[in-house]
Amino acid sequence: MPNSTGKIAQVIGPVVDVAFPINGDLPEINNALTVAKKDGSQLVLEVALELGDGVMRTIAMDSTDGLQRNMAVQDTGGPISVPVGKDTLGRVFNVLGDPIDGGEAFGPDHRRDSIHRDAPKFEDLNTSSEILETGIKVIDLLEPYLRGGKVGLFGGAGVGKTVLIQELIHNIAEEHGGISVFTGVGERTREGNDLYFEMKESGVLENTAMVFGQMNEPPGARMRVALTGLTIAEYFRDVEGQDVLLFIDNIFRFTQAGSEVSALLGRIPSAVGYQPTLATEMGQLQERITSTKKGSVTSIQAIYVPADDYTDPAPATTFAHLDATTNLERRLTEQGIYPAVDPLESSSSALTPEIVGDEHYKVATEVQQVLQRYRELQDIISILGMDELSDEEKVVVARARRIQFFLSQNFNVAERFTGQPGSYVPVEETVKGFKAILDGKYDDYPEDAFRSVGRIEEVVEKAKKMGFAPDDQNTDADEKPAAQAAAN
């Protein structure tokens, strides 16, 4: 049966009402409609509401400039569908799956999947909790990511979000053979452009598909672009059996676009002006991000918090879905510690003995305790100086500073800037290194030897290059009293 044809009844900004014959087949909710504009371009509309008498209210995916009443509108017979598969890697798309990188377009025979899909069924889910090793010490030790989990990435401008994202993409591709999908939702076009060229230069673009719906685009495009990126990621999980990293920057803009669309559709707003369907829309997106028996989609979502108000409905609704948070702190960048992840503010639900093991959990909690004690002592140090501390407190400060520096490491994607080779550190090596520092085995080593290194063995090598010769009697500090270690 041919798909029905209607006519534009009215245009209100990005909202277009389309009248179809009452005795004909009406398009379903979420169906894509097309309008041939006079300039030769084609505008896609998505059905949002049925107003009655054959009139459907739709949301435009691009500018409605040039539309007129009574222009013909064709029902495509299905939702927006986007190209999927290995050919999407290294390419950049818009919300409709059209390439925007100047490359070759996909033919009509290429596989396309609908962006509106159900979450995986219960029987298809992988119920085991498995850690996704990133090779980044501070993440793997203190806020481990769950395979198929969701991570919130917090940080202001210039604290290293982009470099951290690039390193995660690099490590997942190199060590796990995984695929990444980057989705830019409602952010600056310039930032997306810069990210594309940076990823191209660092060599990670070939393992990445990129989808953008930037802040200059209509709210319909910004609301649906996250689903476009997720659909591409789901193909690699469900068909290729891959472990996929899905980056969403910024998940707040997804909510913001939904709020705009809701108001345009005439819905009564809820708390603080947000859409009444906020929790439903967020749930429909987040529940598709999960592990199945075939593969996994692990999501890392940059989150903007309006006015730093964590009780705002938009971030508060997102938090309910997160398994871990990674907080980037400007104070650490000022100290030259990269990645600038705050080890005390970041957290993960996976940091339990049942998931990471007893030794990992014990070392991680001891590291947090030492860093917390150091933070408490900093006020005393800044006012009275180190001399007023007890011998035991001096040991805590010394070890905390070494731990803080050892949490930093060089990134592979930053090697062309720093001239230093990057390092991928397995979880076992990370735990071993921090356990040795906590045990006092490296109390005598200079602090600078711990900066931007990978494994603990690199600390020894760096110290030797600095002219440091460790005393044999200090190599096993378990036998020394803490006060004596501080005195040395």
From Swiss-Prot:
Its main location: membrane. InterPro entries: AAA+_ATPase, ATP-synt_VA_C, ATP_synth_F1_bsu, ATPase_a/bsu_AS, ATPase_alpha/beta_chains, ATPase_F1/V1/A1_a/bsu_N, ATPase_F1/V1/A1_a/bsu_N_sf, ATPase_F1/V1/A1_a/bsu_nucl-bd. The keyword Nucleotide-binding applies. ATP binds at residues 155-162. Keywords: ATP synthesis, ATP-binding, Cell membrane, CF(1), Hydrogen ion transport, Ion transport, Membrane, Nucleotide-binding, Translocase, Transport. Produces ATP from ADP in the presence of a proton gradient across the membrane. The catalytic sites are hosted primarily by the beta subunits. Residues 467-488 are annotated as: Disordered. Belongs to the ATPase alpha/beta chains family. It is an enzyme of class 7 (translocase). SMART domains: AAA. F-type ATPases have 2 components, CF(1) - the catalytic core - and CF(0) - the membrane proton channel. CF(1) has five subunits: alpha(3), beta(3), gamma(1), delta(1), epsilon(1). CF(0) has three main subunits: a(1), b(2) and c(9-12). The alpha and beta chains form an alternating ring which encloses part of the gamma chain. CF(1) is attached to CF(0) by a central stalk formed by the gamma and epsilon chains, while a peripheral stalk is formed by the delta and b chains. It catalyses: ATP + H2O + 4 H(+)(in) = ADP + phosphate + 5 H(+)(out). PROSITE patterns: ATPASE_ALPHA_BETA. Its EC number is 7.1.2.2. Gene3D superfamilies: 2.40.10.170, Bovine Mitochondrial F1-atpase, Atp Synthase Beta Chain, Chain D, domain 3, P-loop containing nucleotide triphosphate hydrolases. HAMAP family: ATP_synth_beta_bact. This is ATP synthase subunit beta. It comes from Lacticaseibacillus paracasei (strain ATCC 334 / BCRC 17002 / CCUG 31169 / CIP 107868 / KCTC 3260 / NRRL B-441) (Lactobacillus paracasei). It is found in: Cell membrane. One of its GO terms (cellular component) is proton-transporting ATP synthase complex.
